[in-house]
């Protein structure tokens, strides 16, 4: 049975993620849960999230979910979305806090260029809307999705890593930043597949078929 735990720590539109997963595989059993044992017993785990990293890490600890999320990221197909990507890294500039430390790197703030200089592209924060994702790593979750396909973003921070071998996708705003990472059983993305129409649904479908 393809059982998927969507981790509920109180941040993000979990219903839209779970409905998208059910749409791409009607036979899948999708459970939105804050129960560590349900997360441990699931075949696959999805960690969405939208908001501030300090609140995210505090919520994981308050609900006793830190260890079950770490275990899932080490042992089973794991999809991180937005904050679910950022929490995997070592630390965040947002609140200068430690994150889970599963992947090497740091969460950094996007730089605004909202100036009067006409030669500088006006870049406002948060980065919100559709943008191209350039695939930098061949991976099963990109199957059937063309490189430079547009996905939907809502974020003010991004992940920076010194290990290029884990970078699976990049986006420009206006400088390039990492928007997807992959290592072993982990695939994590800055954009929102549940808001990204057919491309997002294709990625979620690929995740449900993935056997790392």
UniProtKB/Swiss-Prot annotation:
Domain Glutamine amidotransferase type-1: 3-212
UniProt xrefs under Gene3D superfamilies: 3.40.50.880
Catalytic residues as annotated in Swiss-Prot or TrEMBL: 82, 192, 194
Pfam family membership, one: GATase
UniProt main location, coarse: cytoplasm
Keywords for the protein's UniProt record, in alphabetical order: Amino-acid biosynthesis, Cytoplasm, Glutamine amidotransferase, Histidine biosynthesis, Hydrolase, Lyase
SUPFAM superfamilies in the cross-refs: Class I glutamine amidotransferase-like
GO cellular component: cytoplasm
Catalytic reactions on record: 5-[(5-phospho-1-deoxy-D-ribulos-1-ylimino)methylamino]-1-(5-phospho-beta-D-ribosyl)imidazole-4-carboxamide + L-glutamine = D-erythro-1-(imidazol-4-yl)glycerol 3-phosphate + 5-amino-1-(5-phospho-beta-D-ribosyl)imidazole-4-carboxamide + L-glutamate + H(+); L-glutamine + H2O = L-glutamate + NH4(+)
Main function: IGPS catalyzes the conversion of PRFAR and glutamine to IGP, AICAR and glutamate. The HisH subunit catalyzes the hydrolysis of glutamine to glutamate and ammonia as part of the synthesis of IGP and AICAR. The resulting ammonia molecule is channeled to the active site of HisF.
Record PANTHER family: IMIDAZOLE GLYCEROL PHOSPHATE SYNTHASE SUBUNIT HISH (PTHR42701), IMIDAZOLE GLYCEROL PHOSPHATE SYNTHASE SUBUNIT HISH 1 (PTHR42701:SF2)
Name of the protein in question: Imidazole glycerol phosphate synthase subunit HisH
UniProt organism field: Nitrosomonas europaea (strain ATCC 19718 / CIP 103999 / KCTC 2705 / NBRC 14298)
């Amino acid at each position: 049975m393809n059982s998927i735990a969507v981790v509920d720590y109180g941040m993000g539109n979990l219903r839209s993620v779970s409905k998208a997963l059910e749409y791409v595989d009607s036979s899948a059993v999708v459970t939105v849960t804050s129960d560590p044992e349900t997360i441990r017993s699931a075949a696959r785990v999805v960690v969405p999230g939208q908001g501030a990293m300090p609140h995210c890490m505090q919520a994981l600890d308050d609900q006793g979910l830190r260890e079950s999320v770490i275990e899932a990221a080490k042992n089973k197909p794991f999809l991180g979305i937005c904050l679910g990507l950022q929490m995997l890294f070592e630390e965040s500039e947002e609140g200068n806090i430690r994150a889970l430390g599963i992947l090497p790197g740091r969460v950094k703030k996007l730089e605004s260029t909202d100036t009067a200089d006409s030669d500088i592209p006006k870049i406002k924060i948060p980065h919100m809307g559709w943008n191209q994702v350039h695939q930098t790593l061949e991976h099963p979750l990109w199957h059937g999705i063309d490189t430079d396909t547009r996905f939907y973003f809502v974020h003010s921070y991004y992940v920076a890593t010194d290990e290029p071998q884990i970078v699976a996708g990049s986006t420009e705003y206006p400088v390039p930043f990492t928007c997807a990472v992959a290592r072993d059983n982990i695939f994590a993305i800055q954009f929102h597949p549940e808001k990204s129409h057919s491309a997002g649904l294709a990625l979620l479908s690929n995740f449900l078929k993935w056997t790392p």
